[in-house]
């Protein structure tokens, strides 16, 4: 093989290595830890929920995200090995239920893993590490929005609440970093708080201010007062 051929071969091998590395490491800036208020999710959903709801914020998902540009999705085709969930199941069914269909909790976790969790490498190592990380954040690190609001004496009694009061309460349990809100109208006059997102750096080692939420005029924009 001549010098030209060797150069070509070296270039091809190097390109393959770069391609493999790129496929396993997807760019993202930070994580969104999004929790949804169960009654509001069911009220805003076109199809009624199959089962009664709890007045709790429970996990929607943990999502690698970008401040600018699209968020990564479905970075690998690696499906979740649900047989390994084992003794985590009981905790996950409480903190991360499929609110719309409680007979399909595992399917919900599998879809969240495939769409979002597969893009969290190297912070998220694999499917079981994804589930364990969510449990750690919600329970051990006390990133439970319902508990944070309750500590600030903001209870889910169905009244209109100042969004500023809700934000201040969450900041007090979140190192004074800005959360993100998602709301939705369930009647002409009533807008419910549907989701609260807490944001962390890409290593999940500290809270950061969330980038802006839904813009004014969006169907998910939160007004000054919301039902909770």
Curated annotation (Swiss-Prot):
Please state where this protein is localized. Answer: Secreted, Extracellular space
Task: List the PANTHER family hit by this protein, alphabetically.
Answer: OS07G0630400 PROTEIN, RIBONUCLEASE T2
The active site consists of 60 (proton donor), 112, 116 (proton acceptor)
| Annotated residues for binding of RNA | 36, 60, 98-99, 108, 111-112, 115-116
Question: What role does it play?
Answer: Self-incompatibility (SI) is the inherited ability of a flowering plant to prevent self-fertilization by discriminating between self and non-self pollen during pollination. In many species, self-incompatibility is controlled by the single, multiallelic locus S.
Where in the sequence is the signal peptide annotated? Answer: 1-27
GO molecular function: any one?
ribonuclease T2 activity
Please name every pair of cysteines joined by a disulfide bond in this record.
Answer: 42-49, 75-119, 183-222, 199-210
Read off the Gene3D superfamilies from this record: Ribonuclease T2-like (3.90.730.10)
Query: Could you say which protein family the record assigns here?
Result: Belongs to the RNase T2 family.
An example Pfam family from this entry, by short name, is: Ribonuclease_T2
| Top-level EC class | lyase
Glycosylation sites recorded in the entry for this protein: 87, 101, 144, 160, 175
- UniProt KW keywords: Disulfide bond, Endonuclease, Glycoprotein, Hydrolase, Lyase, Nuclease, Secreted, Signal
What catalytic activity is recorded?
a ribonucleotidyl-ribonucleotide-RNA + H2O = a 3'-end 3'-phospho-ribonucleotide-RNA + a 5'-end dephospho-ribonucleoside-RNA + H(+)
Q: Which InterPro entries match?
A: Ribonuclease_T2_eukaryotic, RNase_T2-like, RNase_T2-like_sf, RNase_T2_His_AS_1
The name under which this protein is listed is Ribonuclease S-4
GO CC terms of this entry? extracellular region
Name the Gene Ontology biological process terms.
Answer: RNA catabolic process
Q: Which E.C. number(s) belong to this protein?
A: 4.6.1.19
Q: Please report the PTM annotation for this entry.
A: The N-glycans attached at Asn-101, Asn-160 and Asn-175 consist predominantly of disaccharide (GlcNAc-GlcNAc). The N-glycan at 87 is 53% monosaccharide and 47% disaccharide. The N-glycan at Asn-144 contains mannose and xylose.
């Amino acid at each position: 093989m001549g010098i030209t051929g060797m150069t070509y071969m070296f270039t091809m091998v190097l390109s393959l290595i770069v391609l493999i590395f790129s496929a396993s490491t997807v760019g993202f800036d930070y994580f969104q830890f999004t929790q949804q208020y169960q009654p509001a999710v069911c009220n805003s959903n076109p199809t009624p929920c199959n089962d009664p709801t709890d007045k709790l914020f429970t996990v929607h998902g943990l999502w690698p995200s970008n401040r600018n540009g699209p968020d990564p999705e479905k970075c690998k085709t690696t499906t979740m090995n649900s047989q390994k969930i084992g003794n985590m199941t009981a905790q996950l069914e409480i903190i991360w239920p499929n609110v719309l269909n409680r007979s399909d909790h595992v399917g919900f976790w599998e879809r969240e893993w495939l769409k979002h969790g597969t893009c969290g490498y190297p912070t998220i190592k694999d499917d079981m590490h994804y589930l364990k990380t969510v449990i750690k954040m919600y329970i051990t690190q006390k990133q439970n929005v319902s508990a944070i609001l309750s500590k600030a004496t903001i209870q889910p009694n169905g009244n209109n609440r100042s969004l500023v009061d809700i934000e201040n309460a969450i900041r007090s349990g979140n190192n004074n970093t800005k959360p993100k809100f998602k709301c939705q109208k369930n009647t002409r006059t009533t807008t419910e708080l549907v989701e609260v997102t807490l944001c962390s750096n890409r290593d999940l080692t500290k809270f950061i201010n969330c980038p802006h939420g839904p813009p004014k005029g969006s169907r998910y924009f939160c007004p000054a007062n919301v039902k909770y």
